[in-house]
């Protein structure tokens, strides 16, 4: 009777014990990668140049976020995220301050899976 190869058994255990990242963890990670200082700057530029109201500015924010998300993860994974986000309402939503008629985006509101992120938390 031969003894089992311990090395193979250990490797199999390691592979079996590895768990994939939860979609919540992936959303948090991706949101932090997408919403950067540059991203917020571009949204604020749009707000000032086009004199957007809060509804238009929120729409612009989400369109830009989704375009960056699609570019970053590809269409298959993007569909998975948008389906999940639509079901659970986890899209990051902007926080705006109104400065005498023009909006400034200072960060994003927390959602079920995404922590609040402020402009000053982001790397310039």
Swiss-Prot record:
Q: Does the keyword Cytoplasm apply?
A: no
Q: Which GO terms describe its cellular component?
A: host cell mitochondrion
Q: Where is this motif: DLNP?
A: 121-124
Its main localization is: host cell
Q: Does the keyword Endoplasmic reticulum apply?
A: no
What are the subcellular locations of this protein?
Host mitochondrion
Q: Keywords for this entry?
A: Host mitochondrion, Host-virus interaction, Inhibition of host innate immune response by virus, Inhibition of host interferon signaling pathway by virus, Inhibition of host IRF3 by virus, Inhibition of host IRF7 by virus, Inhibition of host RIG-I by virus, Inhibition of host RLR pathway by virus, Inhibition of host STAT2 by virus, Inhibition of host TBK1 by virus, Inhibition of host TLR pathway by virus, Interferon antiviral system evasion, Modulation of host cell apoptosis by virus, Viral immunoevasion
For this protein, the record's InterPro entries field holds: RSV_NS2 (IPR004336)
Q: Which GO terms describe its biological process?
A: symbiont-mediated perturbation of host apoptosis; symbiont-mediated suppression of host cytoplasmic pattern recognition receptor signaling pathway via inhibition of IRF3 activity; symbiont-mediated suppression of host cytoplasmic pattern recognition receptor signaling pathway via inhibition of IRF7 activity; symbiont-mediated suppression of host cytoplasmic pattern recognition receptor signaling pathway via inhibition of RIG-I activity; symbiont-mediated suppression of host cytoplasmic pattern recognition receptor signaling pathway via inhibition of TBK1 activity; symbiont-mediated suppression of host JAK-STAT cascade via inhibition of STAT2 activity; symbiont-mediated suppression of host toll-like receptor signaling pathway; symbiont-mediated suppression of host type I interferon-mediated signaling pathway
Q: Which family does it belong to?
A: Belongs to the pneumovirus non-structural protein 2 family.
> Its biological function?
Plays a major role in antagonizing the type I IFN-mediated antiviral response. Acts cooperatively with NS1 to repress activation and nuclear translocation of host IFN-regulatory factor IRF3. Interacts with the host cytoplasmic sensor of viral nucleic acids RIGI and prevents the interaction with its downstream partner MAVS. Together with NS2, participates in the proteasomal degradation of host STAT2, IRF3, IRF7, TBK1 and RIGI through a NS-degradasome involving CUL2 and Elongin-C. The degradasome requires an intact mitochondrial MAVS. Induces host SOCS1 expression.
Q: How does it assemble?
A: Monomer (instable). Homomultimer. Heteromultimer with NS1. Interacts with host RIGI (via N-terminus); this interaction prevents host signaling pathway involved in interferon production. Interacts with host MAP1B/microtubule-associated protein 1B.
The record's comment about this protein's domains reads: The DNLP motif has IFN suppressive functions like binding to host MAP1B.
For this entry, the protein name equals: Non-structural protein 2
Source species: Ovine respiratory syncytial virus (strain WSU 83-1578)
């Amino acid at each position: 009777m031969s003894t089992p190869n311990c090395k193979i058994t250990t490797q199999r255990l390691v592979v079996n014990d590895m768990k994939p990242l939860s979609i919540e963890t992936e959303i948090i990670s991706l949101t932090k990668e997408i919403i950067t200082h540059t991203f917020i700057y571009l949204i604020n530029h749009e707000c000032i140049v086009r004199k957007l109201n809060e509804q238009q500015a929120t729409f612009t924010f989400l369109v830009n976020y989704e375009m960056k998300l699609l570019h970053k993860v590809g269409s298959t994974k993007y569909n998975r995220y948008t389906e999940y986000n639509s079901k659970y309402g986890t899209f990051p939503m902007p926080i705006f301050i109104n400065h005498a008629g023009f909006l400034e985006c200072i960060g994003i509101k927390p959602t079920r899976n995404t922590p609040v992120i402020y402009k000053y938390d982001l790397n310039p």
